[in-house]
């Protein structure tokens, strides 16, 4: 058994609504607003696609997801040879880490970001340098100071999970221009579709300048397919060729592939969902207490407070399950009626 596994623990999901009701003696409905899922669900066309292909369940998937690859290639205007799929971005991150890292290698990322960058590096006996956040976001200058010729991977999350903050195009361009060209920089854009900031990076365009800039995206968030597990990386043809060796032969299911294609084709539905999210998101920042809310470009808001447990329980008492962190609570933006309840709590809470 790998000794480094003693440094880690298995992923611990939050308690189910039923378990929380029992623990806190809560009556009535509970709303799961802890995992940044798209509560509107996927496009109706997804359900149609799934129903149309249920008779194919006894077949293995087509390896490499060729139908979805062609659709993504057309949607993003990138060559199919630069795309690789995983069963969610969790698997994509695992594949990249497994393909690149050897014992003693070093990755550089941020503190308070998506935990799988760290987790998979430790599994591969690599060293992890975590740079503190700056104003709730990635400190690109601080990260750059830790990157050198021997760095094996750099992980950036934009917008960042769990804080929701982002860095702009100019900042990323400047950062990439100073990273050694042989050092892969992975930009995780899981929440890309929710972004409304005009200066958000055009990472696909930056890939034309920097061969070491690699892009992650997913169908789990805005497309509403978290339960079907489809994520992908857009990278150089050479990197994809090597990482594909690590990919399990049938990692993305047939149904998942059909569903993702249907979701991708319904861009009008996606626009409607992301618009609703931005409207509801803005309501939080209208509160006088919004100074405690980090500026978000996602479908969640990070609320800073020293009284984390009290805020978590106050939101739970109005039926909203959120995600506590050491320095605050992450709230998935819900439907209007759910947000109304949370806004009432947030407007009366003592944060200090």
UniProtKB/Swiss-Prot annotation:
Obligatory cofactor(s): pyridoxal 5'-phosphate
Named from the GO MF annotations, one term is:
histidinol-phosphate transaminase activity
- What's one Pfam family the UniProt record gives for this protein? Aminotran_1_2
**Which EC number(s) are documented for this chain?**
2.6.1.9
Catalyzed chemical reaction(s): L-histidinol phosphate + 2-oxoglutarate = 3-(imidazol-4-yl)-2-oxopropyl phosphate + L-glutamate
A Gene Ontology annotation in the biological process aspect, one of them, is: L-histidine biosynthetic process
Keyword set includes Amino-acid biosynthesis? yes
Q: Which UniProt key words apply to this protein?
A: Amino-acid biosynthesis, Aminotransferase, Histidine biosynthesis, Pyridoxal phosphate, Transferase
Query: Signal sequence span per UniProt?
Result: none
Q: Give residues where N6-(pyridoxal phosphate)lysine occurs.
A: 221
> Pathway, per UniProt?
Amino-acid biosynthesis; L-histidine biosynthesis; L-histidine from 5-phospho-alpha-D-ribose 1-diphosphate: step 7/9
Checking PANTHER family in the record gives: HISTIDINOL-PHOSPHATE AMINOTRANSFERASE, HISTIDINOL-PHOSPHATE AMINOTRANSFERASE 2
Q: How does it assemble?
A: Homodimer.
Q: Which family does it belong to?
A: Belongs to the class-II pyridoxal-phosphate-dependent aminotransferase family. Histidinol-phosphate aminotransferase subfamily.
Please identify the protein, giving its name as recorded.
Histidinol-phosphate aminotransferase
